[in-house]
Amino acid sequence: MNAIWIAVAAVSLLGLAFGAILGYASRRFAVEDDPVVEKIDKILPQSQCAQCGYPGCRPYAEAISCNGEKINRCAPGGEAVMLKIAELLNVEPQPLDGEAQELTPARMVAVIDENNCIGCTKCIQACPVDAIVGATRAMHTVMSDLCTGCNLCVDPCPTHCISLQPVAETPDSWKWDLNTIPVRIIPVEHHA
């Protein structure tokens, strides 16, 4: 019994010593990140879709900050992300890449043709935001609220049953411009 307590104490002391060494090393050799890169990375939608030409949102943020890359290449983020980055960097907003005539493209979402889906799960594996649900050899479906329209699920589909379609506008998804709606404050009379 005494040997067990000695072993427990020895392992605990070793864990404490190695933890202290790692804690000291993490502070001593810490690498400071560029705060601008961090801010740009927080603005980007984190869909890791690679439509901008970079393998993910973090490398794209680094390219914008360090290499002067265009701020208009994020397709899932669209105009809203581009405008936030332009405001952060204090630069002129640019038309979205490849869409010089239209600044606000329609939001696209993946749609699966349920009659042709064979349940191979290749689209589920390709989706960077887990917007597709389903099981092997069962029909899959896309959760449109989570879909970023990154187009990464379309190519892996062996039956070509996935397509991108614009999201239909509903009163809930419509972007109301509340500044143009006339509002009048009606005074309320208090009766005692």
From Swiss-Prot:
Binding site for [4Fe-4S] cluster 3: 127, 147, 150, 153
Biological process per Gene Ontology, one example term: electron transport chain
Keyword Phosphoprotein: no
Alphabetized UniProt keyword annotations: 4Fe-4S, Cell inner membrane, Cell membrane, Electron transport, Iron, Iron-sulfur, Membrane, Metal-binding, Repeat, Translocase, Transport
Keyword Calcium: no
Locations listed in the record: Cell inner membrane
EC numbers: 7.-.-.-
UniProt GO molecular function: 4 iron, 4 sulfur cluster binding; electron transfer activity; metal ion binding
Domain 4Fe-4S: 32-91
Residues bound to [4Fe-4S] cluster 1: 49, 52, 57, 74
Superkingdom of the organism of origin: Bacteria
InterPro entries according to UniProt: 4Fe-4S_dom, 4Fe4S_Fe-S-bd, 4Fe4S_Fe_S_CS, 4Fe4S_Ferredoxin_RnfB, Elect_transpt_cplx_RnfB/RsxB, RnfB/RsxB_Proteobac
GO cellular component annotations of the record: plasma membrane
Domain 4Fe-4S ferredoxin-type: 108-137, 138-167
Needed cofactors: [4Fe-4S] cluster
SUPFAM superfamilies per UniProt: 4Fe-4S ferredoxins
Free-text comment on the cofactor: Binds 3 [4Fe-4S] clusters.
Positions bound to [4Fe-4S] cluster 2: 117, 120, 123, 157
Subunit structure: The complex is composed of six subunits: RsxA, RsxB, RsxC, RsxD, RsxE and RsxG.
NCBIfam families the UniProt entry points to: PRK05113.1, rnfB
Annotated function: Part of a membrane-bound complex that couples electron transfer with translocation of ions across the membrane. Required to maintain the reduced state of SoxR.
Family assignment from sequence similarity: Belongs to the 4Fe4S bacterial-type ferredoxin family. RnfB subfamily.
Protein name (Swiss-Prot/TrEMBL): Ion-translocating oxidoreductase complex subunit B
